[in-house]
Curated annotation (Swiss-Prot):
Residues 1-71 are cytoplasmic. InterPro entries: NSG (IPR009431). It comes from the Eukaryota. This is Neuronal vesicle trafficking-associated protein 2. It comes from Mus musculus. GO terms for molecular function: clathrin light chain binding. Disulfide bonds: none annotated. PANTHER family: NEURONAL VESICLE TRAFFICKING-ASSOCIATED PROTEIN 2, NEURONAL VESICLE TRAFFICKING-ASSOCIATED PROTEIN 2-RELATED. It is found in: Membrane; Golgi apparatus, trans-Golgi network membrane; Cell projection, Dendrite; Endosome membrane. The lineage of its organism: Eukaryota, Metazoa, Chordata, Craniata, Vertebrata.
Length: 171
C-alpha cells in the first residue's frame, strides 16, 4: 500500500517505518533516456534476392499434388457422382411410375383407356393402331367438353331435359 500525504521530493524525511505497514513509494519517477530506446544492433543482416533464387527455379515446373489432396478430390468427385445417380434414379422412377387407373380402365401408352376399347382394337388388324389413337384422342376431347359443359353438381339428364318455359300469347 502507499502511504497518503507523503511527498516523494522530500529527501530529509524520516525513513519508512515497517511498524505501520505502509511503504513510501514515489508515484511519479523521472524518465531516463537510456531506458526509452533499445540499443541498435551492431550487425544487420539484409537478405538479398540470390537467397531466394532456388525457389524461383522450381516455380515454373509442374508441381505434383500431394497424395492427400488428390485422394480428397477423388472422394468428393465420387460422392457427387453417386448423388447425381441417385437423383436421376428418383426422377426416372417418378416419371415411369405405374399409374393406377379406375375400375374398367387399362393403363396403356401412358394413358388410362377404357378396357372395352382396348379389347376391341387389340382384336383388330395391326393397321388399326392409328385408328386406336384417333379414338382415344376423340374420347378424351369429348370427355373434356362434357366436363366443361356440365357442372359436377348437376346430373347429365337434368341438363339435357330442361323444361321449356311456356310461351305467352301476345307480343
Amino acid at each position: 500500500m502507499v502511504k497518503l500525504n507523503s511527498n516523494p521530493g522530500e529527501k530529509g524525511a524520516k525513513p519508512p517505518s515497517v511498524e505501520d505497514g505502509f511503504q513510501t513509494v514515489p508515484l511519479i519517477t523521472p524518465l531516463e533516456v537510456n531506458h526509452l530506446q533499445l540499443a541498435a544492433p551492431e550487425k544487420v543482416i539484409v537478405k538479398t534476392r540470390t537467397e531466394y533464387q532456388p525457389e524461383q527455379r522450381n516455380k515454373g515446373k509442374f508441381r505434383v499434388p500431394k497424395i492427400a489432396e488428390f485422394t480428397v478430390t477423388i472422394l468428393v468427385s465420387l460422392a457427387l457422382a453417386f448423388l447425381a445417380c441417385i437423383v436421376f434414379l428418383v426422377v426416372y422412377k417418378a416419371f415411369t411410375y405405374d399409374h393406377s387407373c379406375p375400375e374398367g380402365f387399362v393403363y396403356k401408352h401412358k394413358r388410362c383407356i377404357p378396357a372395352s376399347l382396348d379389347a376391341y382394337y387389340s382384336s383388330q388388324d395391326p393397321s388399326s393402331r392409328s385408328r386406336f389413337y384417333t379414338v382415344i384422342s376423340h374420347y378424351s376431347v369429348a370427355k373434356q367438353s362434357t366436363a366443361r359443359a356440365i357442372g359436377p353438381w348437376l346430373s347429365a339428364a337434368a341438363v339435357i331435359h330442361e323444361p321449356k318455359p311456356p310461351k305467352t300469347q301476345g307480343h
